[in-house]
Amino acid sequence: MLYSKDGYSWKDLDTVLLRPAIGSQKVMRDPSMVQGPDGVFHLVWTSSWRGDKGFGYASSKDLIHWSEQRFIPVMEKEPTTVNVWAPELFYDDEANQYIIIWASCIPGRFERGIEEDSNNHRMYVTTTKDFINFSPTRLFLDPAFSVIDAVIVKRASKDYILVLKDNTRPERDIKVAFSDSPLGPWKNVSKAFTDSYTEGPSVVKLKNEWLIYYDAYRKKIYDASSTKDFIHFESATNKVKVPEAHKHGTIIRVKEKVLKQLLAEYKP
């Protein structure tokens, strides 16, 4: 876990907060976290590269003590599902529910295009109010190309942005789409605002601009772009400072006391 006082310069707690205990491969990739109105932090993650029909889940009140990990089988009714990648949490404060989106590949379900059937992803969604009962899984986004790593951003009521990775060759880059609802439909998918071979976006609002972090995996850096309108983008590479070997995370704001407790517990 990293922490920052300004959203640009980051420091490493240099400790393991949680070790994966569920999933067929027991990995913990692509973590996404939100804090609910009751103060509880909810965390989801990719639990296996391939084979699993769901993702991992755990919760915490302080980011130090964690609940028992659970496996959420969101694609269990689709037996040919290849994978469940990068579940992303969004708290819808108008509907008072959590939205979870992720990328899955179901061979033969969509036009193959230039991708192999086992890499032809679309985004799916479920909603929950309590992380016990979940709405039926449904298609969230089909932009007519393989898409992964999507993130919902709220600018205002009826004004939402979806930051997404075009996972087709030779793209492998990040784009945006627009909607008046966090559940879509999404329209006007943009041209890429990053170079190719980028993925895992995370978005944070900082004063008069939005900062979009992403993994530039060919460059082997955690890169960033800035925007004020999600139409015009500028490189923020020289604005940010991220410790090496970090990628595809989530940025959330926490109260000062939460950070102080973490620093006292782990003493970086």
Label each residue range with its predicted role.
Residues 1-268:
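Carbohydrate-active catalytic/glycan-binding domains of CAZyme proteins
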